UniProtKB/Swiss-Prot annotation:
The active site is at 131 (for autocatalytic cleavage activity), 169 (for autocatalytic cleavage activity). Its EC number is 3.4.21.88. GO terms for biological process: DNA repair; DNA replication; negative regulation of DNA-templated transcription; proteolysis; SOS response. This is LexA repressor. The keyword DNA repair applies. InterPro entries: ArsR-like_HTH, LexA, LexA-like, LexA/Signal_pep-like_sf, LexA_DNA-bd_dom, LexA_repressor, Peptidase_S24_LexA, Peptidase_S24_S26A/B/C. The record marks 95-96 as: Cleavage.
Amino acid sequence: MRVLAKRTETRQLEVLKYIYEQVELKGYPPTVREIGKAVDLSSTSTVHGHLARLEKKGLILRDPTKPRAIELTPEGLEKIGIQPTTIPMLGVVTAGEPILAVEEASDFFPLPPDLRTEENALFMLTIRGESMINAGILDGDQVIVRKQSNANNGDIVIAMTDEDEATCKRFFREVDHIRLQPENDALAPILLDNVTILGKVVGLYRNHI
C-alpha cells in the first residue's frame, strides 16, 4: 500500500511539472490527453483523477467551464521546487466614488505566467463598487495594474484625482477636460481638469462567485 501511495505521489508530481513546463513554454496549460501522453497514462479518466486530487490538495486551480484552465497555486509551485513570482497587493480602490489611495503592500499575489516579463511594473488592487460592471469588473474583484503615467482613450485605468483619491474608470481625454467614464449606465462620468494616471488595468482575478 505504501509503495502504491508513493507511486501515485510521484505521478502527481510529474503531472504538476508537465503543466508548469507547458505553461512556461506555450503560455497556456496542456489538455488532459496531452498530460496523459506526457506522463504515460492512457486513460483520460485516470488523468482526471490525478487532477482532482491535486486540486483537493490545493496544488492546482481549475475552471470546470474551460478544459484548459489549469493553474498551479503557490503551494503547487513550491511542491515542484519553483519559487512563485509575486506582485504587491496595494489595498482597495473604488469603482464608484473616488477613495483615498493605498500605497503600501498589504499582501503579495502569485503572478500569472503570461505577465511575468512585466513583474516589476505590476501591482494589484481590490475593487469596491459596481460602476465597472459592464466591463466585467465586479465588486470584490482584484485587478492587475501595469504602472504607467499615460493612457489612450478607452483604456481602463487607475486614476488619481487632484484630491489624492483613486478610482477605476475608463479614460477619455476630451477638448477641455478629462472624462473618467464608468461602465454602468446608471452612473454619470467624472469630469476633471487634471488626473494622474497610476496605471492601466491589464488583468483580473476573481475568487468569489
